[in-house]
Each structure stands twice: as C-alpha cells, then as structure tokens.
C-alpha cells in the first residue's frame, strides 16, 4: 500500500491522497508467499491455479510437487465444506510450502500452509465479475476452510493524526527514508501508525 501511495503522491500530489485518506480503508500486510488459487465448479470439481492464473494439471502435479501440501489439504476438506462452496468462486491465497517460501524467513507457518487473501467471483466463461476484499467475509471463509485469516492491519477510516503521520512519511525525501530505515523496521513503523496495538507483523514473533 505505502509504495503505491508514494508513487501516487509523486505523480498526482496531495489532492488524490486526501481523497484516498478520506475513504474507508482496508490495509493488509503484504506477505512474501507464493500465489495459489482454487475454484469449485458446479459438478463439485475443484480446479487449482498458479500465480499467473494458469491451471495446475495432473502433469504439473506429477513433475512438480511444489503445490502438493496445499492441494492435498483442499482435497481433504470435509465434504460438508466443499459442497457449500459457491460455484465459480475462486479463493486466492498466499501459500507457504516452508517458512521461507520466497525471500523472507518467517517465525511460524500459517495455518495449513495457507493465508486467505481474496475471493473473486467468476462467471461460466471464467471472467471475473467481482473481487471480495471485505475483511469480515474473508475472516469468515478462512475460518470455514480452516486456514490463516488475512493479515489485516487496518480496517476503517483514518484519524487526523494517522493522516498527518502518513503524509509526513510520503513527504519525506527518499534518501532520508533510506537512512531512517537502516535502523528502524519499515513494517513496524507503518503498523505503529495504523494499528499501535499490534506488537508484531504477521507470522513473526
């Protein structure tokens, strides 16, 4: 979010930032996992996808075992859960085959190797008609599927203090930010503004 806001601020200035800051915001921590998705079809078939939207087929599964933990978990979900998955809903996750799925080493694994991040509703031809980011909906589905809830840092409207602190950050020259974050965690700094009650980032002790 912050990198995106920084680019918007540099290109379009305060006016667009003020508009964004006055809206209802949902801010999630970006997790360094691998993208994994599944979709239930009307015949109760489950289809799996990689990060690029390409389907994971049986040949992929035979030659590449990378997604097996996630696929096996979904395949073994209780029937009562599977049949109640809405048709054509596609559940998106950050997948952890290990505690270091890409570059960052995390202190713990997410529940059943998966963090639910989004749900997209598609039609019969595969076109996305709606994307669900609502925090409550995602939390409810994460509980039903039995995976880690999305790491939501903030959900609501910013206070004047939060707006001023974030603006101050955006207005700070890049070279000063580089110097600052040699000694201070960028993630912890942003969390301290958005949600001071959080004592650590997701999957980190």
Regions found by a protein language model. Name each.
Residues 1-205:
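Core nucleotide-handling region used for phosphoryl-transfer chemistry
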């Amino acid at each position: 979010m912050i990198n995106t806001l920084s680019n918007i601020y540099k290109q379009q200035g305060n006016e667009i930032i003020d508009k964004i800051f006055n809206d209802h915001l949902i801010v999630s921590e970006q997790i360094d996992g691998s993208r994994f998705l599944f979709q239930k079809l009307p015949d109760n078939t489950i289809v799996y996808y990689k990060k690029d939207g390409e389907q994971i087929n049986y040949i992929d599964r035979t030659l590449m075992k990378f997604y097996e933990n996630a696929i096996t978990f979904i395949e073994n979900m209780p029937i009562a859960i599977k049949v109640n998955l809405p048709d054509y809903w596609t559940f998106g996750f950050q997948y952890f085959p290990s505690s270091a799925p890409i570059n960052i080493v995390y202190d713990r694994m997410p529940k059943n190797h998966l963090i639910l991040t989004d749900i997209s509703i598609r039609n019969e031809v595969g076109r996305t008609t709606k994307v669900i980011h609502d925090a409550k909906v995602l939390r409810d589905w994460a509980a039903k599927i039995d995976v880690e809830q999305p790491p939501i840092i903030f959900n609501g409207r910013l206070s004047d203090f939060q707006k001023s602190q974030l603006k101050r950050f955006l207005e700070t020259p890049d070279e000063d930010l580089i110097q600052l974050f040699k000694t201070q965690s960028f993630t912890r700094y942003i969390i301290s503004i958005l949600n001071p009650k959080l004592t650590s980032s997701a999957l980190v002790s």
